[in-house]
Swiss-Prot record:
Gene3D superfamilies: Aldolase class I. GO terms for cellular component: cytoplasm; cytosol; mitochondrion; nucleus. It comes from Schizosaccharomyces pombe (strain 972 / ATCC 24843). It is an enzyme of class 2 (transferase). Coiled coil: none annotated. This is Putative phospho-2-dehydro-3-deoxyheptonate aldolase. The keyword DNA repair does not apply. InterPro entries: Aldolase_TIM, DAHP1/KDSA, DAHP_synth_1.
Length: 368
């Protein structure tokens, strides 16, 4: 009998022949969603609050509520202390404008990158390239719970089919980004999420793929993911009716103006979709200059005040202090407090001024 090399535990004939994992450095175990949700459990009061925030967002998207849905906050969260201070301030504004605006805090934990860069708090919570994802998951859930305790709802972006198992019970509204709206995997994921989802137009400005994504995610799907116990499973969904498009501009130019909104409205109606449009004041619409966001918001406010009912939401990248900063390679203590480490944001004073403008626009729209 020919001699052969015995297989190591967890090895296979294929890996011995180097036909798999040839570019994999290693595998690290990850904590299960069930354990994290038990360790950092949400109270009944918190879950009831999340459900109510979702309902209000869905009602606005569907036209049953004439307020504007505002998704406002940092491009990404990197400092739990600053995030909580922002949430406390935002909650006061949410109460102040509750008759005209439904304000949810943008609390993004993962960042899609066009090339490379810091991928977010879950991926690298220590901002030092150590990629302690198990710590990142815990930090992320703890932050979400603390933000919700301030009395403000939270919004986040969906980047994969696994991380929502750890956090989705706390999210009030979700986004599928411009780079992933066309992805079948993300459309399948959206079809099973328990909260409203906004699909951004493509980076080239194409809104057709966002409408296609709405159609796809409204239907049932089957896809691979993991259970709360961390077991790989086939997920069967029922479809998500609470979806809408987000105009964020693109390489072809901005799309927040009245003509672009009218065109998007017509396209949605042509595809038998409810003309419900959120406009992103940042990204392509701001030409990647945060100082342009209030100008974009002013244009949106003018359209709303003039009676445009298709505009149901606005997204703003905002932080305690304006601008952005790079993550230092060595001394993290040198970082500025309340300043974004990803996209540049407008500061707090500009943010509250935009709230006033949009709230006034909603009141004017009611007279049409």
């Amino acid at each position: 009998m020919d001699k052969h090399t015995p297989l190591l535990p967890g090895d296979s004939v294929f890996s011995r022949c180097k036909t798999e994992d040839s570019r994999i450095k290693g595998y690290d175990p990850v904590i299960s969603p069930a354990l994290i949700q038990s360790e950092l459990a949400a109270s009944d009061e918190t879950l009831a609050f999340v459900s109510d925030q979702r309902r209000q967002a869905a009602d606005i998207i569907a036209g049953r509520d004439d307020r504007l849905l505002l998704i406002v906050g940092p491009c990404s969260l990197h400092d739990p202390v600053a995030a909580k201070e922002y949430a406390i301030r935002l909650q006061k504004e949410a109460i102040k404008h509750k008759k005209d605006l439904h304000i949810i805090m943008r609390a993004y934990l993962e960042k899609p990158r066009t090339t490379v860069g810091w991928k977010g708090l879950i991926n690298d919570p220590d901002l030092d390239g150590s990629y302690n994802i198990n710590k990142g998951i815990r930090v992320a859930r703890r932050i979400f719970l603390e933000l919700l305790e301030t009395g403000v709802g939270i919004a986040s972006e969906m980047l994969d089919t696994i991380s929502p198992q750890y956090l989705a019970d706390l999210i009030c509204w979700g986004a599928i980004g411009a780079r992933t709206t066309e992805s079948q995997l993300h459309r399948e994921l959206a079809s099973g999420l328990s909260f409203p989802i906004g699909f951004k137009n493509a980076t080239d400005g194409n809104i057709g793929i966002a409408i296609d994504a709405m159609n796809s995610s409204a239907n049932p799907h089957h896809f691979l993911s993991v259970t709360k116990q961390g077991v790989v499973a086939i997920v069967t969904t029922t479809g998500n009716p609470d979806t809408h498009i987000i105009l964020r501009g693109g390489k072809s130019g901005t799309n927040f103006d009245a003509d672009s909104v009218a065109g998007a409205k017509a396209k949605l109606e042509e595809c038998n979709k409810l003309p419900s449009i959120m406009i992103d004041c940042s990204h392509g619409n701001s030409s990647k200059n945060h100082k342009n966001q209030p100008k974009v918001a002013a244009c949106i406010a003018e359209q709303v005040a003039n009676g445009q009912k298709a505009i149901t939401g606005v997204m703003i990248e905002s932080h305690l202090n304006e601008g952005k900063q790079a993550i230092p390679e060595d001394d993290l203590s040198s970082m500025k407090y309340g300043v974004s480490v990803t996209d540049a944001c407008i500061g707090w004073d500009d943010t509250t001024a935009v709230f006033e403008q949009l709230a006034a626009a909603v009141r004017s729209r009611r007279s049409h």
